[in-house]
Amino acid sequence: MQIHLANPRGFCAGVDRAITIVERALEIFSPPIYVRHEVVHNKFVVDGLKERGAVFVDELVEVPDDSIVIFSAHGVSQAVRNEASSRGLKVFDATCPLVTKVHMEVMRASSKGTECVLIGHQGHPEVEGTMGQYDNQDGGIYLVESVDDVARLEVKNPSALYYCSQTTLSVDDTADVIDALRAKFPAIEGPRKDDICYATQNRQDSVRELSADCDILLVVGAQNSSNSNRLRELAEKIGAKAHLIADANCIQKEWLANAKHIGVTAGASAPEVLVQGVVDRLKEWGASSATERPGRLENIEFAVPKELRVKQVS
């Protein structure tokens, strides 16, 4: 039984930045530091930050006056920003810069009176934040998840229409939805570069290659992690058995029956320590080796807010 490690896997630059923002805020300003929603979708990461004094809340009403609040990597609506501003809360924004790029696309469309179609998953925090960037009462923003949704979609002005997408979607499925939008609305425009982020693309590419060579794929990630779920779905489409697991304790030994080649990857919010835990468990159960696959080098870094770059001296 051999282990094959996908490359790249795990943390992306946006997740690294978001976690660093919370860590630096805790170091510089001391607990409690409030965070709206899970800063990233991973219980291991969130629990570690809680232990250090981060307090995770669903809405700003739970944040006391004169407090520091951090917006999660998934981004927030303009209404949330306005609420924080009106209350005078000190805000550090951990929104991934690639999500902010999509926000700006929606704001530009809104300012021009162009209607917007967002490809994304209903209820995901990133989608809620992106939808909340559109405020033109004469236009509209519409959410679609599938080609079937496009078939049912009716807009006010098909000649002034723009599409964008959640950054963590299936590359293949999103391409199908974009094709359907262009077929139904020939005048629709979109971003010059796909909104799906580099890390999502790279991790899906590595899983596409790995799944063809493995009997089973284990994806380390949270159940509410969009990009982790897309990795599992992609492996299954290719024909591999795939399981999304939070950590090594979730692996069921019967999954590995007759498996000679086991692939392991991790979603963009899953730390490498969890991957290593999976490798160690598989070796306990008889795996002979763990081989790192070649893959695309990722050297992107996103800067944290200036106020958090150097520890303040009192």
Swiss-Prot record:
<keyword id="KW-0414">Isoprene biosynthesis</keyword>
<comment type="function">
    <text>Catalyzes the conversion of 1-hydroxy-2-methyl-2-(E)-butenyl 4-diphosphate (HMBPP) into a mixture of isopentenyl diphosphate (IPP) and dimethylallyl diphosphate (DMAPP). Acts in the terminal step of the DOXP/MEP pathway for isoprenoid precursor biosynthesis.</text>
</comment>
<feature type="binding site">
    <location>
        <position position="227"/>
    </location>
    <ligand>
        <name>dimethylallyl diphosphate</name>
    </ligand>
</feature>
<protein>
    <recommendedName>
        <fullName>4-hydroxy-3-methylbut-2-enyl diphosphate reductase</fullName>
        <ecNumber>1.17.7.4</ecNumber>
    </recommendedName>
</protein>
<comment type="similarity">
    <text>Belongs to the IspH family.</text>
</comment>
<feature type="binding site">
    <location>
        <position position="227"/>
    </location>
    <ligand>
        <name>(2E)-4-hydroxy-3-methylbut-2-enyl diphosphate</name>
    </ligand>
</feature>
<keyword id="KW-0560">Oxidoreductase</keyword>
<feature type="binding site">
    <location>
        <position position="197"/>
    </location>
    <ligand>
        <name>[4Fe-4S] cluster</name>
    </ligand>
</feature>
<feature type="binding site">
    <location>
        <position position="124"/>
    </location>
    <ligand>
        <name>(2E)-4-hydroxy-3-methylbut-2-enyl diphosphate</name>
    </ligand>
</feature>
<feature type="binding site">
    <location>
        <position position="226"/>
    </location>
    <ligand>
        <name>dimethylallyl diphosphate</name>
    </ligand>
</feature>
<keyword id="KW-0408">Iron</keyword>
<comment type="pathway">
    <text>Isoprenoid biosynthesis; isopentenyl diphosphate biosynthesis via DXP pathway; isopentenyl diphosphate from 1-deoxy-D-xylulose 5-phosphate: step 6/6.</text>
</comment>
<feature type="binding site">
    <location>
        <position position="41"/>
    </location>
    <ligand>
        <name>(2E)-4-hydroxy-3-methylbut-2-enyl diphosphate</name>
    </ligand>
</feature>
<keyword id="KW-0411">Iron-sulfur</keyword>
<dbReference type="InterPro" id="IPR003451">
    <property type="entry name" value="LytB/IspH"/>
</dbReference>
<feature type="binding site">
    <location>
        <position position="227"/>
    </location>
    <ligand>
        <name>isopentenyl diphosphate</name>
    </ligand>
</feature>
<comment type="pathway">
    <text>Isoprenoid biosynthesis; dimethylallyl diphosphate biosynthesis; dimethylallyl diphosphate from (2E)-4-hydroxy-3-methylbutenyl diphosphate: step 1/1.</text>
</comment>
<dbReference type="GO" id="GO:0050992">
    <property type="term" value="P:dimethylallyl diphosphate biosynthetic process"/>
</dbReference>
<dbReference type="Pfam" id="PF02401">
    <property type="entry name" value="LYTB"/>
</dbReference>
<feature type="binding site">
    <location>
        <position position="41"/>
    </location>
    <ligand>
        <name>dimethylallyl diphosphate</name>
    </ligand>
</feature>
<feature type="binding site">
    <location>
        <position position="124"/>
    </location>
    <ligand>
        <name>dimethylallyl diphosphate</name>
    </ligand>
</feature>
<feature type="binding site">
    <location>
        <position position="269"/>
    </location>
    <ligand>
        <name>isopentenyl diphosphate</name>
    </ligand>
</feature>
<feature type="binding site">
    <location>
        <position position="225"/>
    </location>
    <ligand>
        <name>(2E)-4-hydroxy-3-methylbut-2-enyl diphosphate</name>
    </ligand>
</feature>
<dbReference type="GO" id="GO:0016114">
    <property type="term" value="P:terpenoid biosynthetic process"/>
</dbReference>
<feature type="binding site">
    <location>
        <position position="74"/>
    </location>
    <ligand>
        <name>isopentenyl diphosphate</name>
    </ligand>
</feature>
<feature type="binding site">
    <location>
        <position position="269"/>
    </location>
    <ligand>
        <name>dimethylallyl diphosphate</name>
    </ligand>
</feature>
<dbReference type="GO" id="GO:0019288">
    <property type="term" value="P:isopentenyl diphosphate biosynthetic process, methylerythritol 4-phosphate pathway"/>
</dbReference>
<feature type="binding site">
    <location>
        <position position="225"/>
    </location>
    <ligand>
        <name>dimethylallyl diphosphate</name>
    </ligand>
</feature>
<feature type="binding site">
    <location>
        <position position="74"/>
    </location>
    <ligand>
        <name>dimethylallyl diphosphate</name>
    </ligand>
</feature>
<keyword id="KW-0004">4Fe-4S</keyword>
<keyword id="KW-0479">Metal-binding</keyword>
<feature type="binding site">
    <location>
        <position position="96"/>
    </location>
    <ligand>
        <name>[4Fe-4S] cluster</name>
    </ligand>
</feature>
<feature type="binding site">
    <location>
        <position position="269"/>
    </location>
    <ligand>
        <name>(2E)-4-hydroxy-3-methylbut-2-enyl diphosphate</name>
    </ligand>
</feature>
<feature type="active site" description="Proton donor">
    <location>
        <position position="126"/>
    </location>
</feature>
<feature type="binding site">
    <location>
        <position position="167"/>
    </location>
    <ligand>
        <name>(2E)-4-hydroxy-3-methylbut-2-enyl diphosphate</name>
    </ligand>
</feature>
<feature type="binding site">
    <location>
        <position position="74"/>
    </location>
    <ligand>
        <name>(2E)-4-hydroxy-3-methylbut-2-enyl diphosphate</name>
    </ligand>
</feature>
<feature type="binding site">
    <location>
        <position position="12"/>
    </location>
    <ligand>
        <name>[4Fe-4S] cluster</name>
    </ligand>
</feature>
<feature type="binding site">
    <location>
        <position position="225"/>
    </location>
    <ligand>
        <name>isopentenyl diphosphate</name>
    </ligand>
</feature>
<feature type="binding site">
    <location>
        <position position="41"/>
    </location>
    <ligand>
        <name>isopentenyl diphosphate</name>
    </ligand>
</feature>
<feature type="binding site">
    <location>
        <position position="124"/>
    </location>
    <ligand>
        <name>isopentenyl diphosphate</name>
    </ligand>
</feature>
<dbReference type="GO" id="GO:0051539">
    <property type="term" value="F:4 iron, 4 sulfur cluster binding"/>
</dbReference>
<dbReference type="GO" id="GO:0051745">
    <property type="term" value="F:4-hydroxy-3-methylbut-2-enyl diphosphate reductase activity"/>
</dbReference>
